[in-house]
Amino acid sequence: MAKKMKLSEITNMFAGMNVEALEGVTIEGDIEIDLGGLGGFDPMLAAALGQESAVLAQHFARIAGMFGYPVSVGAPAAAPAAVSPALAAPKLKDLIPAKFEFSNIEEWTTQVEEVPIGNTSADGGSRGKRILLGGEKALPFFPDAPMPNRNQVTIDVFDMRLGLAKAVKENYDDVMDNPGEWAKKNVEKFNADMITIHLISTDPLIKDTSPKDAAKTVEEVLQAVDVPIAIGGSGNPQKDPLVLAKAAEVAEGERCLLASASLNLDYAAIAEAALKYDHDVLSWTQLDMNAQKELNRKLMKQCNVPRDRIIMDPTTAALGYGLDYAYTNMERIRLAALMGDDELTFPMSSGTTNAWGARESWMVSSPLKEDSDWGPREYRGPIWEIITGLSLAIAGNDLFMMMHPTSVAVLKHMTQTLFGSIEAEPVDIANWIGAEV
């Protein structure tokens, strides 16, 4: 049996002999590492320890060489023999033929209600066109169930001059004192599908404009444009029902969208005006699906509003200010509707203009000195509104209330391309490095 020696014993053997180096001497043997006390361990650990042991062997060989005692280590294993070309797998000339089919989602059993806005002369009104919202049988842009009606954009108009972001104001500064001209510019120059007239001057804390005078502004807008319109109040829960009722009266037969009925005001009065004067109702809640169900149920059961006259606004939180909540809420509402919740099977509207409430959309730069450059707000603001709108379009939103003309144009182009009414131009992706965006 071969004698076992420790590396330290080899060193001690030559101690005191004044040997500087050995020539022509070869030390042969195996290196053993004592792992006693570890107990059993799995094969993976054994393999790992084997690899580490090989590394240690290399280190021991170098240490021995430093003392003048060369130690040979095992030669590396020979490379595996090359596979004969004759035995190699043949290359495929063609991929295996396969057909991709969209699966039918059995849970989606219910169609979203289709709601018209605007009455033409054939319907007893004076609008030049009627738009349809809703009617979906699946999530938006789903190839297996194409959307019957495209997304629509309504551009905001206000009944008084107010402070707006510079990027927005420069487009409307010449018409902000004339709601009729403002509406006309939105339609003729900025291609608005609808107009939303916000009667903010009726707020008791602003101008406290009377419902009668506010109704005259609605008449002015109706005469200036022939697209469908939405009529909004000031947000004052005491004044809005009175203002919207009077506005509904002067717009009788035009099938406007009254914005809005909510749980914190007299929704019954707004619903009554809608039924009496032939209008639709915007059912507005604040990021709460259960509250949305409750309000819709009350409009239908207590106020007898027909299903084809209800549009929901679950509230839009802008990019950076809760967009994920708004998106999730809308998506949950739409999925619940498709799966049969008849209290939620209505088209949805988004106050996409809320994007301009985010300071990042309109401020010149960050208030923090150490922050990075935000870029020009002339581009940043519209992009903020576009991203907010597009995100909610994917979640299932149908109608977008917007402000900036560029945002409107881009969002309409993107959603109509996804809808299929605009053919996208081919892009040479091979030249992606030098491509212009």
Swiss-Prot record:
This is Acetyl-CoA decarbonylase/synthase complex subunit delta 2. GO terms for biological process: methanogenesis, from acetate; one-carbon metabolic process. Belongs to the CdhD family. Pfam families: CdhD (PF03599). Keywords: Methanogenesis. Pathway: One-carbon metabolism; methanogenesis from acetate. Heterodimer of delta and gamma chains. The ACDS complex is made up of alpha, epsilon, beta, gamma and delta chains with a probable stoichiometry of (alpha(2)epsilon(2))(4)-beta(8)-(gamma(1)delta(1))(8) (Potential). It comes from Methanosarcina thermophila. It comes from the Archaea. One of its GO terms (molecular function) is anaerobic carbon-monoxide dehydrogenase activity. Gene3D superfamilies: Dihydropteroate synthase-like. The keyword Disulfide bond does not apply. Part of a complex that catalyzes the reversible cleavage of acetyl-CoA, allowing growth on acetate as sole source of carbon and energy. Probably maintains the overall quaternary structure of the ACDS complex.
